[in-house]
Regions:
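Terminal-proximal interaction/regulatory segments of ATP-powered molecular machines
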Residues: 311-395
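Mid-core helix/loop region of P-loop NTP-binding domains shared across ATPases and GTPases
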Residues: 2-16, 54, 97-218, 226-244, ...
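Short alpha-helical segments that sit at the start of domains
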Residues: 286-318
Length: 395
């Protein structure tokens, strides 16, 4: 019987040619409406290729305006252009929301060059020295993108940027490490030292939100890659572009498109209609990024599930930390995980708060503000509960 189900699902009529082309990680060959910004970035990096100097650039813009994809696309071209000029340059893209400590960012750089590099138990300074030695010994260059750096600096302070910009300089010789920082806006620069601040300040590429017609072009170019020919109705594209233009967010537009395709497949409709887009809209919330939920660590996921479940069950606006912690223990049991201690649970909550997934404030109850009240403001608790269960099942 299950064999039949398998075959049936495999043979099911689908509107997709390749749905993976709609996933947030996919880097399209062509970036629509970002030629000027790409050119600007190239101009900033010209001296790196011509004079073998180093560069620092900051890319800013709100959610889903193409910061990550611009940097990745640029990095690929930069490597190519350097190679054809006989320059050994590596581009590395690091997401600082995922690699959350200075140590793990630098270890990532080292490991890129040699996965077997012995780095356990060594401090970040030592590791960074190793990177510089490595680059020197091979006459090699490195451009690192520190993506979602604002979030990282808020949590860890300015040391990472400081070390990456200074280590080589302090040792004399050429600085072989260039940086592309990505952040929502420039405000995080204030917590960096004056010298670093000013280099970034002079090299800012600010990406605007996309208009409806720009979003339509982005959608159309992705539809050609991801869908079978002619299955997405033009009205559907217009509607999705309109909906997403309120935020100017291409990620939201592409997610709507993907879910609309899924809705069409669920009905074996063969075409993606505006009604499928409307259905999709009912289950996507641009306020919370899917990747943010997906990239949470296991116990952060369990904690978030506990918050969502508590709020969904109680139907109240707020949940108290003590109650959520009890729910967390139940959730852990359900997923056969050993619950972590109170202090760690506390840290998970703080991190969820920092990511903007939950909102925490003092309850006014208990001693010295020990009790906090937690709310979920951006999405229905019921929706979040289901999402978290889905993600935890995938593990
Ligand atoms: N100009 C574009 N052409 C084609 N696809 C694009 C373009 N801009 C964005 N996208 C796509 O939209 C999605 C979101 O883009 P991206 O991840 O680069 O946004 P972001 O600015 O980094 O957002 P965040 O601040 O949330 O990290 C990705 O799937 C990306 O491929
Ligand atoms: Mg990004």
């Amino acid at each position: 019987m299950y064999g039949d189900i398998f075959e049936e699902e495999m043979n099911r009529e689908t509107v997709f040619r390749d749905a993976s082309k709609l996933m947030p990680e996919y880097v399209p060959q062509v970036l629509v409406h970002r030629e000027e910004e790409f050119r600007q970035l190239t101009r900033f990096f010209k001296p790196v290729l011509e004079n073998r100097s180093s560069q620092r650039v900051l890319i800013t813009g709100s959610v889903g305006v193409g910061k990550t994809v611009l940097a990745r696309r640029f990095g690929a071209e930069l490597e190519k252009a350097a190679g054809s000029r006989g320059m050994n340059l590596t581009y590395l893209h690091i997401n600082c929301r995922k690699d959350r400590t200075i140590y793990s960012v630098i270890a990532k750089i080292l490991q890129h060059f040699n996965p077997r590099w012995p780095y356990y138990g060594l401090g970040p300074e030592k590791l960074l020295n190793d990177v510089v030695n490595y680059l020197n010994s091979r006459d090699a260059y490195l451009t690192v993108t520190l993506d979602e750096l604002d979030f990282f600096v808020q949590q860890n302070g300015p040391n990472l940027v400081y070390s990456l910009t200074r280590t080589a300089e302090e040792r004399g010789g050429p600085n072989r490490i260039s940086l592309i920082a990505i952040a929502r806006d420039k405000s995080f620069l204030r917590s960096l030292d004056a010298a670093t601040q000013s280099t970034f300040m002079h090299n800012v590429i600010a990406l605007d939100r996309y208009s409806a017609s720009q979003l339509k072009d982005i959608l159309l170019s992705r539809i050609r890659e991801a869908f079978k020919h002619g299955v997405v109705e033009e009205d559907t594209v217009d509607l999705i572009a309109d909906i997403a233009s309120r935020w100017g967010d291409a990620r939201f537009a592409l997610e709507l498109l993907w879910r609309a395709g899924m809705a069409a497949d669920a009905e074996a409709a063969g075409v993606v209609t505006p009604e499928h887009a409307r259905k999709a809209k009912a289950e996507v919330y641009p306020e919370i990024k899917r990747e943010v939920l997906r990239d949470l660590q296991l116990h952060e996921k369990l904690t978030l599930l506990a918050v969502a479940r508590k709020l969904n069950l109680s139907k109240r606006a707020y949940a108290f930390t003590g109650d959520v912690e009890k729910t967390y223990r139940v959730v852990c049991e359900e997923y056969r995980e050993e619950p972590r201690r109170h202090t760690q649970f506390w840290e998970y909550l703080q991190r969820l708060n920092a990511l903007g997934v939950v909102d925490i404030k003092p309850s006014g109850l208990g001693q010295r503000g020990q009790t906090l009240k937690i709310s979920i403001q951006e999405v229905p608790a019921e929706w979040l509960e289901k999402e978290m269960e889905k993600l935890l099942r995938e593990k």
